[in-house]
Amino acid sequence: MSPAIAAIIVSYQSASTLDACLLRLREARDIAEIRVVDNDSTDGTLEIVQRHASADARVRFIANPDNPGFAAANNQGVADSQAPWLAFINPDLMVGPETLALLRERALSLGDCVLGVE
């Protein structure tokens, strides 16, 4: 069995793209955890994540009462994850069903490295 992947999304006023992003992540191979860390959105982001969380236990929402910034929010997502592989996903990214699993497999074949998608 391949090591699990945690997808970490930092959102701020991302309601217009987050629903589609979460749908695709939920369908992606080997995604064990989906963490959405929100930096005090007021555009309906919470309702979108709650709907996905009620349908899929892998989705968890971390709501910040203010906007601590992108890096701090990513660190919160990491702290809430248990998976050995982390994927930092922007809320407007639409991942393919195999993309993250293939990146992980490539990284495993290369040894210690960092990969990205262009």
Model-derived regions: residue spans:
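Short, acidic, metal-binding catalytic loop of nucleotide-sugar glycosyltransferases
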Residues: 23-32
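Conserved donor NDP-sugar-binding/catalytic core segment of glycosyltransferases
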Residues: 94-118
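Cell-envelope/extracellular polymer assembly enzymes that use nucleotide-activated donors
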Residues: 4-6, 33
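A conserved acidic beta->alpha catalytic loop
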Residues: 38-47, 66
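Glycine-rich, basic loop-to-helix element that forms the pyrophosphate-binding segment
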Residues: 63-81
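Acidic donor-diphosphate engagement hotspot in glycosyltransferases and nucleotidyltransferases
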Residues: 21, 45, 74, 82, ...
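Short aromatic/hydrophobic "clamp" motif used to bind/position activated sugar donors
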Residues: 86
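Acidic helix N-cap motif at the loop->helix transition within catalytic regions
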Residues: 17-19, 43-52
